[in-house]
Amino acid sequence: MRTVFVGAQEKPNGVSSYTYNLAAELNRKGFKSSVLSFGSCNKESEYKGILIKQYKCPGGTMTSIPILYWKSLPYIIKHRRSIDIVSYQTTTFSIFPSLIVRMFGMKASTIIHSLAEDSPKHGRKMKCLLRAMMKFSLFFSKTIITVSQTKAREIFDRYGAKCHVVSCGVFLPDNRPLNSDVIERNGIRQNKYFLTIGRVDPIKNLEILIDAFKQHEHGDYQLVIGGDTDTEYGKSIVERASDCKNIIFVGMVSGDAKDMLLKNCTAYCLVSSSEGLPIALLEGMAYGKIPIVSRIPAIQEVLEKHNIGLWSDVKNVKQLSENMKSVETDYDSLKVQGELALKIIKENYTWSQIADQYVELGKEIYNT
């Protein structure tokens, strides 16, 4: 079974890490995979042994993805005899490319990580447009994948479309030395900080996290935020935190710098309003960190049945502040939650296990 994944960004961060790492693990298991991505230039490279063919696509994600889908068609058609499945990483924009792919004898699938219309950054008219686009796309999509049972139910309830589930995953940390000065360079205190890393977007409620941290007497604890703040929302949260020297913005981080931050934090925070299945949370859990989380279905699916997590209602500053204070004052009794978090990852969310899920689904797709 040979899969081409189409639609990743230039760097294997955030949602794109799902694409790159699933492809890499499939390749390691003997199922040839490659990734067609969009970025700032045309080039070919490798990531963990898989081919990455990148196409230059102008503009942001909303323009780059449809351009990539059309630009990549000649390559896909040319190599159709060595491709079994073309997996488009968004459902919207993939209707006609996937129809063309199927006309040339290949199978096609699409994936939904989250529903764009749920983001608070969109106004009412844009949300209506996004819902209409998704409804139209789902009508023509033959095989739809999503990343959690929660999201599958949500899509069915909202659109009447049935989805297969292939969860997100992580690689377990190894014991190799990490080559990064991100801790020293930013004046971060090891094992004395709360961490959140990811897309800086209103749906992540970072302003709530900042307010909760500032609201309680945090002593020498710090709040470290990783992600690109060069956006209107990003600049607003930097300004919001400007009167607190213990809130540190480290920018976008990946590789050893990201691992260094995860390894040395006290607790990992994710207080979003909506998620598909959050890779960022899984990464924190893989390092055995206490999860401080908002009570939303996707996070409940991961944690609630195991009775772990320090929970707050969405946008509830008081509850979140109390949870952060609990970690600071009662860490010794709460650290067992981090140990349980790592156990959950080992039993359910390693990339090896996720790749096995995809292989089973791939066989089903190939035989239909």
Residue map of PLM features:
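Membrane-proximal helix-turn-helix segments that form the acceptor-binding/catalytic region
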Residues: 77, 103-104, 127-144
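Short His-centered aromatic/hydrophobic patch
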Residues: 88-94, 112
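Nucleotide-activated donor-binding/catalytic signature segment of Leloir-type glycosyltransferases, i.e.
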Residues: 235-253
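Aromatic "clamp/platform" in nucleotide-sugar-dependent glycosyltransferases that forms part
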Residues: 273
